Amino acid sequence: MKIRKSILAGTLAIVLASPLVTNLDKNEAQASTSLPTSNEYQNEKLANELKSLLDELNVNELATGSLNTYYKRTIKISGLKAMYALKSKDFKKMSEAKYQLQKIYNEIDEALKSKY
């Protein structure tokens, strides 16, 4: 009985030491990193939307020339926050900056409509 166990243990040790078994864990599947994840896609989409809102910043800033100084201050502050958020690439900051820019743009439109 002891001889059988020692033969079995020796055979098992030889099989486990063979190159076929030792190379098994080297053939692991690697995840592809070339495709963007859903978070990266959402961040990129939000960054593009924020950039397009920033492109409209100068036009809206010029439109505030005849309005109250509140609009001038608010649009400058919102623009600076949006630029900072784009540099940081933080989703939360970008979404807040986008909301603020859209809000002030709508307020400027309403103020211009009521004035003229």
UniProtKB/Swiss-Prot annotation:
Main location: secreted
One Pfam entry name: CompInhib_SCIN
Induction: Up-regulated by agr and sae loci. Down-regulated by sigma B factor.
Keyword hit for Kinase: no
Gene Ontology, cellular component aspect: extracellular region
Protein's cellular compartments: Secreted
Position of the signal peptide: 1-31
Disulfide bonds, paired cysteine numbers: none
Positions of the UniProt region annotated as Essential for activity: 62-79
Keyword terms of this UniProt record: Secreted, Signal, Virulence
InterPro entries with a match to the protein in the record: HSP70_C_sf, SCIN
Domain of life: Bacteria
Entry's family note: Belongs to the SCIN family.
Record function comment: Involved in countering the first line of host defense mechanisms. Efficiently inhibits opsonization, phagocytosis and killing of S.aureus by human neutrophils. Acts by binding and stabilizing human C3 convertases (C4b2a and C3bBb), leading to their inactivation. The convertases are no longer able to cleave complement C3, therefore preventing further C3b deposition on the bacterial surface and phagocytosis of the bacterium. Also prevents C5a-induced neutrophil responses.
Protein name stated in the entry: Staphylococcal complement inhibitor
Gene: scn
